[in-house]
Amino acid sequence: MKKLTVAISAVAASVLMAMSAQAAEIYNKDSNKLDLYGKVNAKHYFSSNDADDGDTTYARLGFKGETQINDQLTGFGQWEYEFKGNRAESQGSSKDKTHLAFAGLKFGDYGSIDYGRNYGVAYDIGAWTDVLPEFGGDTWTQTDVFMTGRTTGFATYRNNDFFGLVDGLNFAAQYQGKNDRSDFDNYTEGNGDGFGFSATYEYEGFGIGATYAKSDRTDTQVNAGKVLPEVFASGKNAEVWAAGLKYDANNIYLATTYSETQNMTVFADHFVANKAQNFEAVAQYQFDFGLRPSVAYLQSKGKDLGVWGDQDLVKYVDVGATYYFNKNMSTFVDYKINLLDKNDFTKALGVSTDDIVAVGLVYQF
């Protein structure tokens, strides 16, 4: 409670530090356009768990470019990088990272093709509930874990409005090349060849969507499961299917997703579940004066975890709010109420059961 009081006080202080900003268009001439965008998220976590307590400030910088080749053909590219702001200068940039780096071509109503580091098609559904002020999106959409979040080697085809014939009907197909990260510290971030699909339909604020993806697993991942089947999945393929619903109109945002994964979901940073059933739901309301309260529930249950049986991997209620001073400046508080109980499973594998409060001040353009 003491840390929560401190966190709320920090939000009040951050409100007094608000300032205005403007977006940056670098170039727009002769059918060529280049936009620069970025964000500074000055934030702090408060938690009884030392690993989740402290400064987590970062900055992101990126650009989006577009060139009109002819009436039906457009080239585009995007790059985004994150710089950590909570490290000593002597520690260098080892934790900085590339989020996005891809380029492609758009063929009018016939869709677009791009290649590079991008979002997996499974995130087309996962993104609907990954909208909390700070937390969220952590039951099954994970960075560098097959096709559920950002990762490398994606070739993606996207088609919006179904060839220009049906407004709101979008679909995508994706291929991911092999990324064999064989060192054990990063083995969960590897993948074999894979493919995935997604489809969404949105009409007057309502949306429905589904996705499916399947990939080969690397030899390191499969062999780890043979050695320790209690904590490492041993299947040769990783699969995910997910479905989602959302409503986004009249200042109201409601969304829910359900998914199941096989030999894919990472828990406690190092281990992989044989199977996981995942549920996320979020509700938000945007007041005209800038306040956006948020409440959510997220749960991931691991199935058939060897001697551990079925166990909750993630389970929490999230209560938070964002206040927008204008389109460039905002502040937030987000309270993750962890519902996991301390037991033999969480203690043995290092699964956190502590609450976290995050507060921050964000400038973006």
UniProtKB/Swiss-Prot annotation:
Disulfide bonds: none
UniProt-recorded Gene Ontology molecular function terms: porin activity
UniProt cross-references to CDD domains, sorted A to Z: gram_neg_porins
Record's bilayer topology term: Multi-pass membrane protein
Subcellular localization: Host cell outer membrane
Keyword Ribonucleoprotein: no
UniProt keyword list: Host cell outer membrane, Host membrane, Ion transport, Membrane, Porin, Signal, Transmembrane, Transmembrane beta strand, Transport
GO CC annotations on file: host cell plasma membrane; pore complex
Pfam families: Porin_1
GO biological process: one example: monoatomic ion transmembrane transport
Residues annotated as signal peptide: 1-23
Family note: Belongs to the Gram-negative porin family.
Subunit structure of this chain's protein: Homotrimer.
Function noted in UniProt: Forms pores that allow passive diffusion of small molecules across the host cell outer membrane.
Note: A porin gene can also be found in the genomes of certain lambdoid bacteriophage, and its protein is expressed in the lysogenic state. In E.coli the expression of ompC and ompF proteins is then reduced substantially.
UniProt xrefs under NCBIfam families: PRK10554.1 (NF007841)
Protein known as: Outer membrane porin protein LC
Species: Enterobacteria phage PA-2 (Bacteriophage PA-2)
Phylogenetic classification of the source organism: Viruses, Duplodnaviria, Heunggongvirae, Uroviricota, Caudoviricetes
